[in-house]
Amino acid sequence: SYRHLLPEQHVLTADVLKAIDYETLALLAGLFLVIRGIERAGIIDDLSHIITGMGGGNLFLTYTIIVWASVLISAFVDNIPYTDTMLPVVGGVATALGVDQTVLCFGLLVGATLGGNLTPVGASANIAACGILRREGYEVSAGQFMRIGVPFTLAAVLTGYVLVWLFYAGL
Protein backbone atom coordinates (compact mmCIF):
# COMPACT_ATOMS: atom_id res chain seq x y z
CA SER A 1 0.00 0.00 0.00
CA TYR A 2 1.12 3.55 -0.74
CA ARG A 3 -0.71 4.99 2.24
CA HIS A 4 2.55 5.56 4.13
CA LEU A 5 3.60 8.05 1.45
CA LEU A 6 0.63 10.34 2.08
CA PRO A 7 0.95 13.23 4.54
CA GLU A 8 -0.44 12.69 8.02
CA GLN A 9 -2.54 15.83 8.01
CA HIS A 10 -5.54 16.16 5.73
CA VAL A 11 -5.72 19.03 3.28
CA LEU A 12 -9.12 20.65 3.04
CA THR A 13 -10.47 21.41 -0.41
CA ALA A 14 -11.33 24.92 0.74
CA ASP A 15 -7.69 25.52 1.68
CA VAL A 16 -6.53 24.33 -1.72
CA LEU A 17 -9.05 26.57 -3.48
CA LYS A 18 -7.88 29.58 -1.43
CA ALA A 19 -4.25 28.93 -2.39
CA ILE A 20 -4.91 29.05 -6.14
CA ASP A 21 -3.77 32.23 -7.87
CA TYR A 22 -6.92 32.86 -9.93
CA GLU A 23 -5.56 36.07 -11.47
CA THR A 24 -2.64 34.19 -13.02
CA LEU A 25 -4.89 31.33 -14.09
CA ALA A 26 -7.28 33.75 -15.83
CA LEU A 27 -4.40 35.53 -17.58
CA LEU A 28 -3.02 32.28 -18.97
CA ALA A 29 -6.47 31.06 -20.06
CA GLY A 30 -7.04 34.37 -21.85
CA LEU A 31 -3.72 34.07 -23.67
CA PHE A 32 -4.62 30.62 -24.96
CA LEU A 33 -8.00 31.87 -26.20
CA VAL A 34 -6.46 34.82 -28.06
CA ILE A 35 -3.90 32.59 -29.75
CA ARG A 36 -6.63 30.13 -30.84
CA GLY A 37 -8.58 33.04 -32.32
CA ILE A 38 -5.54 34.16 -34.29
CA GLU A 39 -5.11 30.66 -35.62
CA ARG A 40 -8.77 30.36 -36.69
CA ALA A 41 -8.65 33.76 -38.39
CA GLY A 42 -6.09 32.40 -40.90
CA ILE A 43 -3.22 34.49 -39.61
CA ILE A 44 -1.03 31.36 -39.33
CA ASP A 45 -0.89 30.94 -43.11
CA ASP A 46 -0.25 34.65 -43.55
CA LEU A 47 2.65 34.49 -41.09
CA SER A 48 4.17 31.52 -42.96
CA HIS A 49 4.13 33.52 -46.20
CA ILE A 50 5.57 36.63 -44.53
CA ILE A 51 8.44 34.75 -42.87
CA THR A 52 9.21 32.83 -46.05
CA GLY A 53 9.28 36.10 -48.01
CA MET A 54 11.49 37.85 -45.47
CA GLY A 55 13.96 34.96 -45.57
CA GLY A 56 14.19 35.20 -49.36
CA GLY A 57 14.66 31.44 -49.70
CA ASN A 58 17.78 31.49 -47.50
CA LEU A 59 17.51 28.87 -44.75
CA PHE A 60 20.01 30.57 -42.41
CA LEU A 61 18.29 33.95 -42.72
CA THR A 62 14.89 32.32 -42.17
CA TYR A 63 16.25 30.48 -39.10
CA THR A 64 17.64 33.78 -37.78
CA ILE A 65 14.29 35.54 -38.28
CA ILE A 66 12.41 32.77 -36.48
CA VAL A 67 14.81 32.76 -33.50
CA TRP A 68 14.93 36.51 -32.91
CA ALA A 69 11.27 37.20 -33.71
CA SER A 70 10.41 34.44 -31.23
CA VAL A 71 12.60 36.04 -28.57
CA LEU A 72 10.85 39.39 -28.96
CA ILE A 73 7.33 37.99 -29.16
CA SER A 74 7.85 35.55 -26.28
CA ALA A 75 8.96 38.42 -24.09
CA PHE A 76 5.34 39.60 -24.07
CA VAL A 77 3.28 36.55 -25.08
CA ASP A 78 3.49 33.41 -22.96
CA ASN A 79 5.79 30.96 -24.71
CA ILE A 80 3.45 27.96 -24.50
CA PRO A 81 0.58 29.32 -26.60
CA TYR A 82 3.08 31.14 -28.83
CA THR A 83 4.99 27.93 -29.57
CA ASP A 84 1.73 26.05 -30.05
CA THR A 85 0.66 28.66 -32.59
CA MET A 86 3.99 28.92 -34.37
CA LEU A 87 4.67 25.21 -34.91
CA PRO A 88 2.30 25.05 -37.90
CA VAL A 89 3.77 28.34 -39.17
CA VAL A 90 7.27 26.86 -39.04
CA GLY A 91 5.99 23.73 -40.77
CA GLY A 92 4.54 25.90 -43.54
CA VAL A 93 7.80 27.81 -43.89
CA ALA A 94 9.80 24.56 -44.12
CA THR A 95 7.42 23.23 -46.77
CA ALA A 96 7.70 26.47 -48.77
CA LEU A 97 11.50 26.26 -48.59
CA GLY A 98 11.52 22.54 -49.40
CA VAL A 99 13.57 21.69 -46.31
CA ASP A 100 13.22 19.51 -43.25
CA GLN A 101 11.63 21.55 -40.48
CA THR A 102 13.97 20.34 -37.70
CA VAL A 103 16.37 23.30 -37.58
CA LEU A 104 13.50 25.79 -37.85
CA CYS A 105 11.62 24.04 -35.02
CA PHE A 106 14.71 24.15 -32.83
CA GLY A 107 15.13 27.83 -33.70
CA LEU A 108 11.55 28.39 -32.59
CA LEU A 109 12.22 26.53 -29.35
CA VAL A 110 15.41 28.46 -28.60
CA GLY A 111 13.74 31.81 -29.24
CA ALA A 112 10.41 31.07 -27.58
CA THR A 113 11.57 29.25 -24.47
CA LEU A 114 14.51 31.51 -23.70
CA GLY A 115 12.86 34.73 -24.92
CA GLY A 116 10.22 34.31 -22.26
CA ASN A 117 12.86 35.17 -19.68
CA LEU A 118 13.13 38.78 -20.85
CA THR A 119 10.04 40.00 -19.00
CA PRO A 120 7.83 38.97 -16.07
CA VAL A 121 4.96 38.09 -18.46
CA GLY A 122 7.02 36.12 -20.99
CA ALA A 123 6.62 32.69 -19.40
CA SER A 124 4.05 30.94 -17.26
CA ALA A 125 6.69 30.32 -14.61
CA ASN A 126 7.53 34.04 -14.47
CA ILE A 127 3.86 34.98 -14.13
CA ALA A 128 3.31 32.39 -11.42
CA ALA A 129 6.49 33.33 -9.54
CA CYS A 130 5.66 37.04 -9.58
CA GLY A 131 2.13 36.20 -8.40
CA ILE A 132 3.50 34.15 -5.52
CA LEU A 133 5.96 36.91 -4.59
CA ARG A 134 3.17 39.51 -4.70
CA ARG A 135 0.96 37.34 -2.50
CA GLU A 136 3.85 37.08 -0.01
CA GLY A 137 4.29 40.85 0.05
CA TYR A 138 7.20 41.27 -2.38
CA GLU A 139 6.68 43.39 -5.48
CA VAL A 140 9.01 42.82 -8.43
CA SER A 141 8.77 45.57 -11.02
CA ALA A 142 9.25 44.90 -14.73
CA GLY A 143 12.46 46.94 -14.58
CA GLN A 144 13.87 44.89 -11.71
CA PHE A 145 13.00 41.68 -13.50
CA MET A 146 14.52 42.84 -16.79
CA ARG A 147 17.81 43.96 -15.22
CA ILE A 148 18.48 40.27 -14.71
CA GLY A 149 16.34 38.87 -17.53
CA VAL A 150 17.81 40.79 -20.46
CA PRO A 151 21.51 39.90 -20.07
CA PHE A 152 20.69 36.31 -19.12
CA THR A 153 18.35 35.92 -22.08
CA LEU A 154 20.76 37.42 -24.59
CA ALA A 155 23.60 35.16 -23.43
CA ALA A 156 21.40 32.06 -23.44
CA VAL A 157 19.77 32.78 -26.82
CA LEU A 158 23.06 33.61 -28.53
CA THR A 159 24.55 30.37 -27.25
CA GLY A 160 21.55 28.30 -28.32
CA TYR A 161 21.26 30.10 -31.67
CA VAL A 162 24.87 29.37 -32.59
CA LEU A 163 24.93 25.80 -31.26
CA VAL A 164 21.70 24.73 -32.98
CA TRP A 165 22.96 26.06 -36.30
CA LEU A 166 26.41 24.48 -35.86
CA PHE A 167 24.91 21.09 -35.00
CA TYR A 168 22.46 21.39 -37.89
CA ALA A 169 25.24 22.32 -40.30
CA GLY A 170 27.21 19.30 -39.10
CA LEU A 171 30.20 21.15 -37.70
Regions found by a protein language model. Give the residues of each.
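Hydrophobic transmembrane alpha-helices of multi-pass solute/ion transporters
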Residues: 1-60
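Hydrophobic core of alpha-helical transmembrane segments in multi-pass integral membrane proteins
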Residues: 1-2, 157-163
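Small-residue-rich segments of transmembrane alpha-helices in multi-pass membrane proteins
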Residues: 19-34, 88, 92-96, 151-158
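C-terminal TM-helix exit segments that contain a strictly Trp-centered aromatic cap at the helix terminus
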Residues: 35, 119, 163-165
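Membrane-interfacial helix-loop connectors
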Residues: 40-138
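Interfacial loop-to-transmembrane junctions
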Residues: 131-155
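Juxtamembrane boundary at the C-terminal end of a transmembrane helix
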Residues: 161-171
